[in-house]
Amino acid sequence: QHHEEDMDLMLEMGVNAMRLAHYQQDEYMYQLTDQSGILVWAEIPFVGPGGYADKGFIDLPALKENGRQQLVELIRQNFNHPSIVCWGLFNELKEEGDNPIPYIRELNQLAHQEDTTRPTTSASNQGGSLNFLTDLIAWNRYDGWYGSTPKTLADFLDSTHRKHPELRLGISEYGAGASIYHQQDTLKQPAPAGYWHPENWQTYYHIENWKIIHERPFVWGSFVWNMFDFGAAHRREGDRPGINDKGLVTFDRKVRKDAFYFYQANWNTTQPVLHLAGAQNRNSDY
């Protein structure tokens, strides 16, 4: 029932692809994507340190064998799902510490041994040799949220494409936090780690970032982070602890944020969309 509710909301918004991060998903979700014609990036849980004080990869035989097993199981269990278009090998790894590059090469070869028909991909958040190992590469970018402005996304994409035109590059994550209870009349960039996560900044962020992505046909795909607010135990930001509020829909699936309707207007070609942004701002003078 929960998977069906999530799928209905995504179809309502008009998505045509999803990244099922960062781990194997329930079989029923793959059945729903098959039925709905949504393209899927499926991946194993080989994840860098993120917000935790760790290095992500530890060069131990047990860890590497576990990764091999999970990749083989992911591919063999889901090989016949037509919605799956690529296999993801890692998310936000670092070359510092134990260098994961030889192991990623091994996983890439293993994926092609198991499936000769689908490309491999990965989600990076830095430069270096990590970005030249899989068939496709995508970056997690938060230009205009974790500092900088949306314009830096344009600079990054253009510069990377100019230097490495051979790279098949995409955007694996982009997003900004928002609380439906935080409303402001002015457009002011908030502090990501702070309490105040105004909804209108998230809307602005997505309008500007999507414009940049849409204008660059060399970007093979892009994935909003995230469709729904979700639990994240280490986070102490926004209006609730333990929640990542970058979703376009609230955690309980009850409220579609303004940015949801922006994408619906751009992506859903089957129905017209009229939505008044900022309607939840009860303190406005207009």
How does the language model describe each region?
Residues Q1-Y286:
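Extended substrate-binding grooves/exosites of carbohydrate-active enzymes
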